[in-house]
């Protein structure tokens, strides 16, 4: 179980700063605007571990439960490097984009809530969707779900492999983005949509460059303006050792593009219409908004 040490919790549920000199003196405007009352911030620096009775994910991200905090900037490296090779495959439960074994370069992530925990290596992106465009995301944002939710899974490099990292409380981080469905196609996503029929059956795959396969969401990642909280994997084995990093501002895709994901076949050889887990109890864990 992941542990984020709680500095101190006041009776109103807000976070008290260890060092008042480290507290924010004002709340800068962010986009999209967050209409919630500011909480006392945590000190600057990466987040240490926290322990709670249950840290299952996904959750409903309520702005009223969040504390605005200055954290070190997130640093994404080599995500679209030409040396990164990606395998897009139908796992029977989702579309997954794995870094190929022969990839010369492997993207990394550091900073933010991970600053005290080292460098995290990108392992895969996988996608969640639902039967309807308003039911596709796993996390809710102020009780609202989106059409698509993407999870970029990273593992702490001190554990060498994803499988080993899953055994440790500081082993994993998942960067999350959302997509809202409308009438207009997302041109960056269209190449992938055109390839989905070639992996309609489970355990089929195609090889791509990182730019062809990951560019459709790369603009979402910023050094700040994200939520972070301690949670779990949303698929088996549901280990509670994930630093979640969630960008609330959605990108846009078309309903037609979302439907293309639903047309993929599951392990049971039926259309995979939904693969999103239900929201789990919040359990008063820390919820941070990085500014």
Where would I find each of the regions flagged by the language model?
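Alpha-carbonic anhydrase
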Residues: 2-291
């Amino acid at each position: 179980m992941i542990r984020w040490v709680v500095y101190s919790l006041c009776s109103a549920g807000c976070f008290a700063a260890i060092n008042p000199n480290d507290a924010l003196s004002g709340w800068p405007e962010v986009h999209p605007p967050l209409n919630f009352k500011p909480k006392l911030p945590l000190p600057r620096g990466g987040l240490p571990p926290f322990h709670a009775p249950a840290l299952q994910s996904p959750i409903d991200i309520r702005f009223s439960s969040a504390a605005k905090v200055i954290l070190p900037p997130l640093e994404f490296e080599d995500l679209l490097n030409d040396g990164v090779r990606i395998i897009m495959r139908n796992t029977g439960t989702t579309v997954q984009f794995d870094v190929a074994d022969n990839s010369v370069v492997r993207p990394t992530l550091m900073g933010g809530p991970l600053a005290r925990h080292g460098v995290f290596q990108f392992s895969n992106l996988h996608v969640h969707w639902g039967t309807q465009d308003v039911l596709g995301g796993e996390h809710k944002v102020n009780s609202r779900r989106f059409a698509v939710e993407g999870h970029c899974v990273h593992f702490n490099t001190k554990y060498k492999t994803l499988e080993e990292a899953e055994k440790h409380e500081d082993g994993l981080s998942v960067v999350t983005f959302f997509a809202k469905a409308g009438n207009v196609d997302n041109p960056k996503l269209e190449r992938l949509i055109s390839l989905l029929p070639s992996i309609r059956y489970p355990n089929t795959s195609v090889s791509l460059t990182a730019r062809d396969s990951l560019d459709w969401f790369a603009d979402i990642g910023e050094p700040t303006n994200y939520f972070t909280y301690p949670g779990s994997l949303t698929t088996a084995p549901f280990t509670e050792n994930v630093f979640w990093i969630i960008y609330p501002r959605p990108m846009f895709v078309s309903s037609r593009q979302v439907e293309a994901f639903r047309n993929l076949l599951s392990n049971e050889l039926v259309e995979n219409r939904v693969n999103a887990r239900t929201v789990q109890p919040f359990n008063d864990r820390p919820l941070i908004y990085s500014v």
